[in-house]
């Protein structure tokens, strides 16, 4: 398995682990009714969470090659592999168009 795929799986696990804490801290920080000192403490707690537990660090990658660009979300396969599999007839219902 490629290192990029392993790294992405690790980030996904961290995101899943800290998702509820992160959402709670963000909601409380944006609440204007709370004391400013409490909001500052919550901001510090949010900053202490692992950086890789953030959702923006998770990258959609191809499950076959690990490619990070032009990955179709509905099947998690890159456009290059999708085309290869479609040409081989391994994807049902997908035919090359001709007119």
Swiss-Prot record:
Keyword entries, A-Z: Mitochondrion, Ribonucleoprotein, Ribosomal protein
Family statement: Belongs to the universal ribosomal protein uS14 family.
Gene Ontology CC, one term: mitochondrion
Recorded GO MF terms: structural constituent of ribosome
Pfam families linked: Ribosomal_S14
Coiled coil: none
Stored NCBIfam families: PRK08881.1
Name used for this protein in its record: Small ribosomal subunit protein uS14m
Gene3D superfamilies: 1.10.287.1480
Gene: RPS14
């Amino acid at each position: 398995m490629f290192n990029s795929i392993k790294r992405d799986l690790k980030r996904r696990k961290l995101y899943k682990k800290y998702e509820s804490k992160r959402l709670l801290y963000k909601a409380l920080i944006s609440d204007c009714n709370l004391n400013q000192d409490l909001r500052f403490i919550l901001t510090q707690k949010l900053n202490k969470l692992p950086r890789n537990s953030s959702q923006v660090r998770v990258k959609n990658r191809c499950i076959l090659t690990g490619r990070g660009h032009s990955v179709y979300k509905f099947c998690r396969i890159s456009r290059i592999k999708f085309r290869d599999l479609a040409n081989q007839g391994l994807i049902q219902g997908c035919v090359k168009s001709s007119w």
